[in-house]
Amino acid sequence: MSSAVVASSTTFLVALASSASRGGPRRGRVVGVAAPPALLYDGRAGRLALRAPPPPRPRPRRRDAGVVRRADDGENEAAVERAGEDDDEEEEFSSGAWQPPRSRRGGVGKVLKRRGTVPPVGRYGSGGDAARVRGAAAPAPAPTQDAASSKNGALLSGRDDDTPASRNGSVVTGADKPAAATPPVTITKLPAPDSPVILPSVDKPQPEFVIPDATAPAPPPPGSNPRSSAPLPKPDNSEFAEDKSAKVVESAPKPKATRSSPIPAVEEETWDFKKYFDLNEPDAAEDGDDDDDWADSDASDSEIDQDDDSGPLAGENVMNVIVVAAECSPWCKTGGLGDVAGALPKALARRGHRVMVVVPRYGDYAEAQDVGIRKYYKAAGQDLEVKYFHAFIDGVDFVFIDAPLFRHRQDDIYGGNRQEIMKRMILFCKAAVEVPWHVPCGGVPYGDGNLVFLANDWHTALLPVYLKAYYRDNGMMQYTRSVLVIHNIAYQGRGPVDEFPYMELPEHYLDHFKLYDPVGGEHANIFGAGLKMADRVVTVSPGYLWELKTTEGGWGLHDIIRENDWKMNGIVNGIDYREWNPEVDVHLQSDGYANYTVASLDSSKPRCKAALQRELGLEVRDDVPLIGFIGRLDGQKGVDIIGDAMPWIAGQDVQLVLLGSGRRDLEVMLQRFEAQHNSKVRGWVGFSVKMAHRITAGADVLVMPSRFEPCGLNQLYAMAYGTVPVVHAVGGLRDTMSAFDPFEDTGLGWTFDRAEPHKLIEALGHCLETYRKYKESWRGLQVRGMSQDLSWDHAAELYEEVLVKAKYQW
């Protein structure tokens, strides 16, 4: 075939026609001479065939005409410049009315009819390097304002929008010199396209499609171009849906541009093809929209999104938190630990965390349901079966661990000998550390990622040890952390070293348990090992943390606390206002009691006092001060100090009510006081939640002579109920109480600096004198106490900071 093509190519003769006269043939005309038939490749038929080139047609001799040509994809650009091209490959225009030329075929080369007297540049170019100007012997006139306003200097076609042809190299030809009667036509060389464009299918006429150009200059001021102020009709989007093959080839992003066309482009801000719309879908822009409308719409949508999706209070710090404690209010409680385990998890849940509380199942709790999980754990050399019960209350998962060792101990949680207590706590900690894997709370277990255990006191101090020894040392639960909370360091889980094997730990862990006590000698200390293994440690008040570092307040663990001071934090407890709130307290809604607020303090609190006097069999007197004590009966709470001050108290015109359980000798003391001073003293042995609420509401004074108090909750409850505290200034009592100043009329109650009977008598005497003689000052104490924000929400925020520190600790 190559020889036939070469032979046929030699038959072409090229002659240049020249004329000296202006009206003669144009300079630079390329005239093709017909050649004999040759074996040529027929692209339309897809085969070789004998063909003769068509005879050349004379070009019209019009001096005022410009010619616009275009080529199909893949056509040689040199063939476009060849003379003798078909008329349907040209567009001729003059100053008169323009008519579209004839066309044999559709597709890319087809001329699309447009409005106006000046025909447009071809919509789809050949993809060549640049537009070519033929017959440009005379220099082109300076660009007009219309030409400057068109993007990339494209030939104006009755509109100022950006067309594909203006960026893809349409072939432009023009006459040598325009006629005098014809307005000058601006011919500007087009730059090479920045990115290729895949053309739509040629089976049907293509719709008009405008691709925004991000490199275009800013548009002229409004009114400078009359034609740009008249928007054209928007293309019919239905044509886009019909052509499934049309798409745009992605190119590099371009900077932001301002459109000069009144028709909005698809993407306004940046040339981001990831956001580019699909041609098969309707156009999102509507007629008449502009940039300002779109910006306003985006801004309003953003504001709505921010309002509707504010997110949790914890923000990106949302975590899975498991609180592990030996007691939890309202199911089982002997002191402040039960209140913390019942209230803190709810406050954390309100901040957006997923929270679980794990406690032993001491009795039959109606809210808890058996989840059907059975596990076996070894405690003190014995395999014991464990069942899991679950309840979901106030946004918190409560998981109860059921085992024979825990049953029927509702009223004696910490009872039994040392070996029995240790056996229960070993089983409890082993079962609790695997709860996030086994218990499907809400159908989805917590898992071991983004998880923090919050252990409380020595009863659960083995949990950080088991977490590290069983799992983290073996490559499991690597993203699980543990925080140990110190509520009372006086109870440490001490035992002989030879009982260490009962804990089922590796032998080298014995070094973490060994502790030498000058009094007791060498022993195994569970609390000490937990403090070492925990990622973070929290005390229930900053003052208590300071005391723990001293020899007197550290109870033998002060050296460990000093060594781990970097991970210590002091956070004061809060109040669960849904349970401890005089305005909604359910225990004040019967038997003559009444709910009250600051506004109704003067009328409703005396009603609670009278109801309490009647219920306990005391004389109903509004003028007599009613003193209350609520707490555990042991040496820490200082109830024996009250016993030493009893002769002075019995000589005053007062009434005294004591509620608590604990040491048997102290229980007998309460019963003896009631028998000796039956008209003034009542001793309630045991613990009653209802009676605790009613004493707090009905008493005028709450006395707390604790020898040490890590935080203390009863003084917080008392202030919230308008009851004035008299406390020993130690630990958390010092942090939460400020002494009354009669000259400045400030403070919340009375404090004394030593746990001695005469100091208690001195502070209590000042309190009673103020109650009897200075009613306005007394009411100021009540109002200031009730006006404080003592909720758990602030404490939960501080706990969250500690949890985040533990999370990112390695």
Curated annotation (Swiss-Prot):
As listed in the record, the transit peptide stretches over 1-16
Specify the signal sequence span: none
Residues binding ADP-alpha-D-glucose are: K333
Gene Ontology cellular component terms for the protein in this record? amyloplast; chloroplast
List every stretch annotated Disordered. Answer: 43-265, 281-313
Ranges of Low complexity composition bias in the record: 129-148
Q: Where is the composition biased (Basic residues)?
A: 102-116
Q: What is its EC number?
A: 2.4.1.21
GO molecular-function annotation terms?
alpha-1,4-glucan glucosyltransferase (ADP-glucose donor) activity; alpha-1,4-glucan glucosyltransferase (UDP-glucose donor) activity
Query: A Pfam family in this protein?
Result: Glyco_trans_1_4
- Which GO BP annotation is one of this protein's? starch biosynthetic process
Q: Where is the composition biased (Basic and acidic residues)?
A: 63-83
Specify the pathway.
Glycan biosynthesis; starch biosynthesis
What is this protein's function?
Answer: Plays an important role during endosperm starch synthesis. Determines the type of amylopectin structure of starch grain. Synthesizes long B1 amylopectin chains by elongating short A and B1 chains, independently of the other soluble starch synthases. Barely active in japonica subspecies.
Q: Which family does it belong to?
A: Belongs to the glycosyltransferase 1 family. Bacterial/plant glycogen synthase subfamily.
- Other comments on record: Increased activity due to variations in subspecies indica is associated with the synthesis of the L-type amylopectin, which contains much lower proportion of short amylopectin chains than the S-type amylopectin found in most japonica varieties. The difference in amylopectin chain composition explains why starch from japonica subspecies has a lower gelatinisation temperature than starch from indica subspecies.
Q: What is this protein called?
A: Soluble starch synthase 2-3, chloroplastic/amyloplastic
